[in-house]
């Protein structure tokens, strides 16, 4: 089966100078992939010419006359730039010409245009960016990582439902554990939105294990961690910054003296494995869940190596039938939730996690 992906070549901080080389390298490594390169035709052709890939049959140019800038307001992307590379790329998915879209463009614009073009799955008000973050035994699915800065309690419940469905679909787990990211484990902690979301989650039939904290993200405490996009994006980029700092410190320390350089040579295999594990670029590319089509969001600052990983996220998602499996799991889950109810004031309650004491009134995509 040929995997057909559409690439928003103009998106991100670097545009075609990053997206086109990544696309060329990807198709050369994946003979069953066909990529549609969407954007300003002259800019794309110039990059393909440099790479001697103008005649590559696995690459097709789809012209677009406009570009959504990284600082464009949502309304500009949605209402004024109707022939943007982002919108044309998403239309390829809508029309069935492609099976997934990969973009490094403006996050707010991508979410809004995706919702408009592809529409959301039944019962979902807002898409959410979800990604599998590594832990010692596998991964923890975390959402939202930046699509929704402000959320209502019911949106966090919907994110939990999507996370549940995705892990159930990918891992075959009947009842993935869910945690709500908060400043403490206690039920009384957090702002009103978090408290109300906790009530909704406890009243649902989801396997909600209570609040989790930032230090639980990489421990594997739960299968799914739910948060709003503001908190999630800060947590993600803080993690990436920390990983980069650790790599820089190790490089600096091993380069301090002749002795340390000799030790670095002896430890080189271990250091290379460490570098590979903490290189945040290989974790680039997160799914925009809740849509009737596959959309992968890359970091806007991604280089060609990182963007190639984002393309691979889309490729793997298509090969694994993620969209179809997610839609089925969401449908099955909605029946289950319908039995339990969403009303936090109802009788349906979930058992608290071990060590978590409920108030009387309260009731893993592997690395590509």
UniProtKB/Swiss-Prot annotation:
Stretches of the chain forming a coiled coil according to its record: none
GO cellular component terms, semicolon-separated: cytoplasm
A matching Pfam family: FA_synthesis
Subcellular locations according to the entry: Cytoplasm
Keyword annotations: Cytoplasm, Lipid biosynthesis, Lipid metabolism, Phospholipid biosynthesis, Phospholipid metabolism, Transferase
Keyword hit for tRNA-binding: no
GO BP annotations listed: fatty acid biosynthetic process; phospholipid biosynthetic process
GO molecular function, one term: phosphate:acyl-[acyl carrier protein] acyltransferase activity
Superkingdom of the source species: Bacteria
Catalysed conversion reaction: a fatty acyl-[ACP] + phosphate = an acyl phosphate + holo-[ACP]
Region (Disordered): 338-368
Pathway: Lipid metabolism; phospholipid metabolism
InterPro entries assigned: FA_synthesis, Phospholipid_synth_PlsX-like
Primary enzyme class: transferase
HAMAP family per UniProt: PlsX
Role according to the record: Catalyzes the reversible formation of acyl-phosphate (acyl-PO(4)) from acyl-[acyl-carrier-protein] (acyl-ACP). This enzyme utilizes acyl-ACP as fatty acyl donor, but not acyl-CoA.
Similarity comment text for this entry: Belongs to the PlsX family.
Subunit: Homodimer. Probably interacts with PlsY.
NCBIfam families attached to this UniProt entry: plsX
Protein name as annotated: Phosphate acyltransferase
Organism for this UniProt entry: Burkholderia ambifaria (strain MC40-6)
């Amino acid at each position: 089966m040929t995997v057909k992906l559409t690439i928003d070549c103009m998106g991100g901080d670097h545009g075609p100078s990053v997206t086109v080389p990544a696309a060329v390298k990807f198709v050369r490594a994946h003979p069953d992939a066909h990529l549609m390169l969407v954007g300003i035709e002259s800019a794309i052709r110039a990059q393909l010419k440099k790479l001697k890939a103008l005649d590559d049959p696995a690459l097709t140019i789809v012209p677009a006359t406009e570009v959504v800038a990284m600082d464009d307001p949502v309304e500009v992307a949605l209402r004024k730039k109707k022939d943007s590379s982002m919108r044309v790329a998403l239309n390829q998915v809508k029309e069935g010409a492609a099976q997934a879209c990969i973009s490094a463009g403006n996050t707010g614009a991508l979410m809004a245009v995706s919702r408009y073009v592809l529409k959301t799955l039944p019962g979902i008000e807002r898409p959410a960016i979800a990604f599998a973050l590594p832990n010692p035994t596998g991964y923890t699915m975390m959402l939202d990582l930046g699509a929704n800065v402000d959320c209502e309690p019911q949106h966090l419940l919907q994110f939990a439902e999507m996370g549940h469905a995705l892990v159930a679909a990918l891992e075959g787990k009947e009842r993935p554990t869910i945690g709500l990211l908060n400043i403490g484990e206690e039920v009384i902690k957090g702002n009103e939105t978090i408290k109300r979301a906790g009530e909704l989650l406890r009243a649902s039939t989801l396997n909600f294990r209570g609040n989790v904290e930032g230090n639980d993200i990489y421990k594997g405490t739960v299968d799914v961690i739910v948060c709003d996009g503001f908190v999630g994006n800060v947590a993600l980029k803080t993690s990436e910054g920390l990983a980069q700092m650790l790599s820089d410190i190790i490089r600096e320390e091993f380069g301090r003296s002749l002795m340390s350089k000799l030790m670095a040579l002896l430890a080189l295999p271990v250091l290379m494995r460490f570098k590979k594990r903490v290189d945040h670029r290989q974790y680039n590319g997160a799914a925009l869940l809740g849509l009737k089509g596959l959309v992968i969001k890359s970091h806007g600052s991604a280089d060609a190596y990182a963007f190639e990983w984002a393309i691979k996220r889309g490729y793997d998602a298509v090969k694994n039938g993620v969209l179809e499996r997610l839609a089925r799991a969401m449908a099955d889950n909605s029946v289950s939730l319908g039995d339990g109810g969403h009303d936090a004031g109802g009788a349906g309650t979930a058992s608290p996690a071990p060590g978590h004491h409920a108030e009387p009134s309260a009731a893993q995509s592997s690395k590509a």
